[in-house]
């Protein structure tokens, strides 16, 4: 099911329990070490960086290394080196999710003790036969943790949320009401659990990321509510597509960002985000180019539609999905 199958825009919605204006802005970039950063990764990193710096906020980096089978040795250090090469320097220490297992287990135990989660032995094939959405079969079976996943008992489904770029988005009801997995059967911590705990613990006030993560947002907000955490605001940036119209990704073998002069690539990224460009951008120092971009950053003019990127980093745009 695509993102556009699960979400539509609506005209009115007021989100409760957000951080207030008195909180200092804290943003983040949270890549997984499954490969080097590519142009699509740069769009998310640059967009979140400019949004944070334009509000005199902090910009944190977190390595989401909770899925070892998908990780590539050395990718985390290369990602950090790439960010530095492109002038995107972060605040504070880099956080690694692999160091937070005890914290995740603490919250899992809390949810279980409070009756807010339960164990489930349903297989992926069974759920696929149901159309891809879990039906709550194990909700009242009182199963043990043996060879079982742990699911959130959904009590606060979120049917819509506000995106600062896209407006108000409405989720498919079956997605919003699903008891989703927070601890996998194979013992790994689910992405939705880890990201909510870490964003809360790091004091993240706004999440700026790619539009491919619109769908999990309602699940994450529901978990925020059940844990009584303050909910950050959200911005979902347009995706970069390859020439075949697919999302530029590590899984689709997107080429790594070049390690040559970063300025032409940054200018292409700014152009992709529909931002104004300095007349002498190629001649500016990297730090001056980024400072100029921070001063002229405007979220309101970022496009909604995905776009095709070419290998020469020109702006070949075409309409596409989020």
Swiss-Prot record:
Look up the EC number in the record and give it: 6.1.1.-
**GO MF entries:** ATP binding; glutamate-tRNA ligase activity; zinc ion binding
Chain ranges passing through the membrane: none
What keywords are annotated for this sequence in UniProt? Aminoacyl-tRNA synthetase, ATP-binding, Ligase, Metal-binding, Nucleotide-binding, Zinc
**What cofactor does this chain's UniProt record say it requires?**
Zn(2+)
**What's any one GO cellular component for it?**
cytosol
Annotated residues that bind Zn(2+) are located at: 120, 122, 134, 138
- Record-linked Pfam families: tRNA-synt_1c (PF00749)
Q: Which residues bind ATP?
A: 250
* Locus of motif 'HIGH' region: 31-41
Question: What InterPro entries does its record include?
Answer: Glu-Q_tRNA(Asp)_Synthase, Glu/Gln-tRNA-synth, Glu/Gln-tRNA-synth_Ib_cat-dom, GluQ/Sye, Rossmann-like_a/b/a_fold
Q: Which residues bind L-glutamate?
A: 28-32, 64, 191, 209
Question: In its UniProt record, which GO terms are filed under biological process?
Answer: glutamyl-tRNA aminoacylation; tRNA modification
Instruction: Copy out the cofactor comment.
Output: Binds 1 zinc ion per subunit.
Find motif ('KMSKS' region) and give its ranges: 247-251
Fetch the PANTHER family from UniProt: GLUTAMATE--TRNA LIGASE (PTHR43311), GLUTAMYL-Q TRNA(ASP) SYNTHETASE (PTHR43311:SF1)
The role this protein plays is:
Catalyzes the tRNA-independent activation of glutamate in presence of ATP and the subsequent transfer of glutamate onto a tRNA(Asp). Glutamate is transferred on the 2-amino-5-(4,5-dihydroxy-2-cyclopenten-1-yl) moiety of the queuosine in the wobble position of the QUC anticodon.
The family this protein is said to belong to: Belongs to the class-I aminoacyl-tRNA synthetase family. GluQ subfamily.
Know the name of this protein?
Glutamyl-Q tRNA(Asp) synthetase
Q: Which organism is it from?
A: Pectobacterium atrosepticum (strain SCRI 1043 / ATCC BAA-672) (Erwinia carotovora subsp. atroseptica)
Gene designation per UniProt: gluQ
């Amino acid at each position: 099911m695509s993102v556009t199958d699960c979400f539509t825009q609506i005209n009115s919605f007021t989100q409760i329990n957000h951080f207030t204006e008195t909180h200092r802005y804290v943003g983040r970039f949270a890549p997984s070490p499954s490969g080097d950063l590519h142009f699509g990764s740069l769009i998310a990193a640059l967009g979140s960086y400019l949004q944070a710096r334009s509000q005199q906020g902090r910009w944190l980096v977190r390595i989401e290394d909770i899925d070892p089978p998908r990780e590539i040795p050395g990718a985390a250090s290369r990602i950090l080196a790439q960010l530095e090469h492109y002038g995107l320097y972060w605040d504070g220490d880099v956080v690694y999710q692999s160091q937070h297992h005890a914290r995740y287990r603490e919250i899992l135990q809390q949810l279980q003790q409070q009756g807010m989660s339960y164990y489930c032995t349903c297989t992926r094939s069974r759920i696929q036969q149901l159309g891809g959405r879990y039906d709550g079969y194990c909700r009242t079976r009182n199963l043990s943790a043996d060879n079982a996943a742990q699911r959130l008992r959904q009590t606060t489904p979120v049917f819509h949320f506000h995106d600062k770029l896209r407006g108000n988005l409405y989720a498919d009801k079956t997605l919003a009401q699903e008891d989703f997995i927070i601890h996998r059967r194979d013992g790994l911590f689910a992405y939705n659990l880890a990201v909510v705990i870490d964003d809360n613990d790091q004091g993240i006030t706004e999440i700026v990321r790619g539009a491919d993560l619109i769908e999990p947002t309602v699940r994450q907000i529901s978990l925020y509510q059940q844990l009584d955490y303050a909910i950050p605001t959200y911005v979902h940036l347009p995706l970069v597509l390859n020439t075949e119209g697919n999302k530029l990704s590590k899984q689709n073998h997107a080429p790594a960002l070049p390690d040559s002069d970063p300025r032409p690539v940054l200018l292409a990224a700014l152009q992709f985000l529909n931002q104004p460009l300095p007349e002498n951008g190629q001649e500016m120092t990297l730090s001056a180019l980024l400072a100029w971009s921070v001063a002229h950053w405007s979220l309101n003019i970022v496009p909604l539609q995905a776009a095709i990127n070419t290998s020469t980093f020109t702006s070949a745009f075409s309409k596409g999905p989020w």
